[in-house]
């Protein structure tokens, strides 16, 4: 039992892929008025794929390709196999991202932004502490209500973090006059810095386009990187690129189970590899979902009906309940183990403790 717990811990740790992408965005506490989703009747267009939907609704179709953008285009084209492997990583999330962007009337090509941010990897963690598909920094995540608990990190959750990121992008897009280059620069470098540099150039009578602003090198490179991948997707035939087959339809569904559920038990129930379950539900940071009345799992949509038919039978024998104990004065591992009728060695393994020392207010399972 304990070794299974440790096995799960090491699996989760191995899935946390370090990314070089960094996000230094920080919006002021006195956030500007946030845009509301737009209720519109979507045109009844039968797109052949997600790629076609992005291309036909892109607002960058006739963009000017400067030398920096061409440099990144050539870099992608120099290794078509690597570029294809990059695109495949968005398979389970890009349709959902596109739907959310359309809800706020944002440019469809922003669905490609996670390729720049995180390689569409929900486990991605930068050296600066940014996390998830959208590389949220802690301060920005808090403003947009993303929770971080012992059990759950919503910056890693691909769907919840996407909803927050789209709200943030809508805010930036409105704040900077729906200028896409400004929106991208603000997302990467922070809106306060961008606004300051725009005002400074205006005061000095200098051009105000993003290339003329004094911005960090990373932010300067961010826009052409994005423009390059947009160009290759929107004009894939021109560059002889075979795009992965992503249908223009939802590929993820939701299964809601009663109580707290172990991830490995659910993976066996769904007949999915644990690594895949964690990928679709990357917000779960431990071997089980958070203690709650219900647990929601993202799964391939074709499995939803089958799992819903059998979920009551599954939860009757697989529901778990963990008790959390907060360390108080006078506590020791021996006393806590005696109180909960368990062993000190079990407590240490489950809580990843290397010694018998405890900290005041430390939470133990």
Place the predicted regions along the sequence by residue.
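An acidic, Gly/Ser/Thr/Pro-rich helix-cap/linker signature
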Residues: 19-105, 110
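Primarily a LysM-type cell-wall glycan-binding module
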Residues: 244-274, 317-341, 354, 359-363
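Second-shell loop/turn segments in exported
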Residues: 73-87, 97-99, 121-131, 147-159, ...
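Sec-dependent N-terminal signal peptides
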Residues: 9-18
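Substrate-binding/active-site groove segments that recognize
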Residues: 128-150, 162-169, 194-197
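Short, functionally critical alpha-helical segments immediately adjacent to catalytic or ligand/cofactor-binding
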Residues: 106-123, 183-188, 277-281, 350-351, ...
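Extracellular LysM carbohydrate-binding repeats and other cell-envelope/extracellular binding modules
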Residues: 280-313, 343-365
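Secretory-pathway/luminal and periplasmic proteins that interact with or process carbohydrate-rich
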Residues: 119-127, 142-144, 172-175, 191-204, ...
